[in-house]
Amino acid sequence: NPTLPALLDVLFRDAVNSTLGTHIANLAPANIPRQDLVAAFLTGFPGVNQLKTVTASEMSRLNTGIPAKPASQQSAFGVAGNDLAGFPNGRRPGDDVVDLALRVVMGRLCHPIPVNGTPTDLGLCKPADAPVGTAPFTDGAPLSAADFDSRFPYLKTPNPGATN
C-alpha cells in the first residue's frame, strides 16, 4: 500500500470534506494491490508505452510510433490529459510530472481518461475505489510547454533577480 495517498488523506481529508461539503471517510484509493500504479510507473500501458517483453521496472519508456505534438498542442498532463505523446510515454520538459503523479497516486486512472478525445476506462480499478480521483491535485507550480524554448537547452533566460 503506497504511503503518499495515506499521508495526503491524513493531511487534507478534513479540508476536502469541509470544502466539498462531503463526508469522505478516506481520500486514499482503496484498490489494493494498486494495478493502476504498476501500469503507470512500472510496466507501461498496452498500446502506448508498454514494451513487447514486460519487465516491471522504473524506466523511461517511449513509443516512437506515436507522433510528437507541437508545444501548442501538448497537455501538461500527458496521457491522462488526452496527449498520448506525453508522460508516461517519454518525458517532455513541459510535462507536469509532479501534478500528474499526485493525480495518479490519488486514483485518476480509476476513472475514465480521455484517449484521442474519447473517455476510456483502462480497467485498472473502479471509480468507487478512488473517491477523489478526478480532483485536480497540484503542487501549485503550474508547468506547460510554453515555459520552455523549442531547442536545447530548452530553459528560457531567467528573469532578473531582486535588487536587494
Predicted regions and their residues:
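Surface-exposed extracytoplasmic segments
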Residues: 1-164
